Curated annotation (Swiss-Prot):
<feature type="short sequence motif" description="SH3-binding">
    <location>
        <begin position="73"/>
        <end position="80"/>
    </location>
</feature>
<feature type="short sequence motif" description="PDZ-binding">
    <location>
        <begin position="347"/>
        <end position="350"/>
    </location>
</feature>
<comment type="subunit">
    <text>Homodimer. Interacts with host CREB1, CREBBP and EP300.</text>
</comment>
<keyword id="KW-1077">G0/G1 host cell cycle checkpoint dysregulation by virus</keyword>
<feature type="modified residue" description="Phosphothreonine; by host">
    <location>
        <position position="215"/>
    </location>
</feature>
<feature type="modified residue" description="Phosphothreonine; by host">
    <location>
        <position position="184"/>
    </location>
</feature>
<feature type="short sequence motif" description="Nuclear export signal">
    <location>
        <begin position="188"/>
        <end position="202"/>
    </location>
</feature>
<keyword id="KW-1035">Host cytoplasm</keyword>
<feature type="region of interest" description="Interaction with CREBBP/P300">
    <location>
        <begin position="81"/>
        <end position="95"/>
    </location>
</feature>
<keyword id="KW-1048">Host nucleus</keyword>
<feature type="region of interest" description="Interaction with CREBBP C-terminus">
    <location>
        <begin position="312"/>
        <end position="319"/>
    </location>
</feature>
<dbReference type="Pfam" id="PF02959">
    <property type="entry name" value="Tax"/>
</dbReference>
<keyword id="KW-0805">Transcription regulation</keyword>
<dbReference type="GO" id="GO:0003677">
    <property type="term" value="F:DNA binding"/>
</dbReference>
<feature type="region of interest" description="Interaction with CREB1">
    <location>
        <begin position="1"/>
        <end position="58"/>
    </location>
</feature>
<feature type="zinc finger region">
    <location>
        <begin position="23"/>
        <end position="49"/>
    </location>
</feature>
<keyword id="KW-0804">Transcription</keyword>
Length: 350
């Protein structure tokens, strides 16, 4: 399907791009100030000009790889506004500082959710559907918690610029093949560029599975993982659940919050909740307005759920930021409620 030449928006980020022929979208090369090649991928996370051998960030114009590393143009949205005056010689970009996270934090993480039995396992039970994600433009959101003083993003689902994140995570758990489930036909190299850009812009510690997704741009933290990727999307529509945002559980007892179920054949946006919520409301399912009144959740502009907790109670604070509490020989969780058992769906009238 071809488009008429003209201006449009990036399918992934929404920044201004120029559309020309055969559904190809590209950005303007910072060196020449014009379209150098039609081979720029429309889903490119980092734009590349093969003619000038330069790679740059389409969001802020920062040159990532070039002999002219620090000749960074600040390009206006439209080429008629772009002149040689837009090229400015800037100082080298500052390197993002990695937050100081004590070793006890990583030790506690390996023993508690989402790490179970010293392995990063699925937290969504066994109910993985055999369906595709219905809308390529719809992205599930991240699951944010606060461990001590560090904001943790359990899984990297929201693929958007950092300025749109509700919280800037210090630690990110990520399975690259899960990202690939929501970015169809995107090479793994592009996924690496995404993680690398997040690493540069936030300074977050990125935790990837061992023996998976070898990286060349940066060296992330590795952790044991037997986690299966989501090749086919999210949970299917649940007919018995008619109210968006009900709290329910899977067969493994993991407490969850389900988002809207538009219609049969489409998935429900489901994110993991804290056992703290389940301990408070395990006898009934609650309407999102009830949870909002208790400041346990909030809606985003995409009408999906963000979980903002004061704590993630399955991980005792003493294990996170107390060096003496990190006993390697102790494999049992100390303190904090244990994940409940039973997978019955409980509903209540709202």
């Amino acid at each position: 399907m071809a488009h008429f030449p003209g201006f449009g928006q990036s399918l992934l980020y929404g920044y201004p791009v120029y559309v020309f022929g055969d559904c190809v979208q590209a950005d303007w090369c910072p060196i020449s100030g014009g379209l150098c090649s039609a081979r720029l991928h429309r889903h490119a996370l980092l734009a590349t000009c093969p003619e000038h051998q330069i790679t740059w960030d389409p969001i802020d114009g920062r040159v990532v790889s070039s002999a002219l590393q620090y000749l960074i143009p600040r390009l206006p949205s439209f080429p008629t506004q772009r002149t040689t005056r837009t090229l400015k010689v800037l100082t080298p970009p500052t390197t993002a500082t990695t937050p100081k996270v004590p070793p006890s934090f990583f030790h506690a993480v390996k023993k508690h959710t989402p790490f179970r039995n010293n392995c990063l396992e699925l937290t969504l039970g066994e109910q993985l559907p055999a369906m595709s994600f219905p809308d390529p433009g719809l992205r599930p959101q991240n699951v944010y918690t606060i461990w001590g003083c560090s904001v943790v993003c359990l899984y990297l689902y929201q693929l958007s610029p950092p300025m749109t994140w509700p919280l800037i995570p210090h630690v990110i758990f990520c399975h690259p093949e899960q990202l690939g489930a929501f970015l169809t036909r995107v090479p793994t190299k592009r996924l690496e560029e995404l993680l690398y850009k997040i690493f540069l812009s936030t300074g977050a510690i990125i935790i990837l599975p061992e023996n998976c997704f070898p990286t060349t741009l940066f060296q992330p933290t590795r952790a044991p993982a037997i986690q299966a990727p989501w090749h086919t999307g999210l949970l299917p529509c649940q007919k018995e659940i008619v109210t968006p945002g009900l709290i329910w559980t899977f067969t493994d007892g993991s407490p969850m919050i389900s988002g809207p179920c538009p219609k049969e054949g489409q998935p429900s946006l489901v994110v993991q909740s804290s056992t703290f919520i389940f301990q408070q409301f395990q006898t009934k399912a609650s309407h999102p307005a009830f949870l909002l009144s208790h400041k346990l959740i909030q809606y985003s502009s995409f009408h999906s759920l963000h979980l903002l907790f004061e704590e993630y109670s399955t991980v005792p604070f003493s294990l996170l930021f107390n060096e003496k509490g990190a006993n390697v020989s102790d494999d049992e969780p100390r303190g904090g409620p244990q994940p409940p058992t039973g997978g019955q769906i409980a509903e209540s009238s709202v």
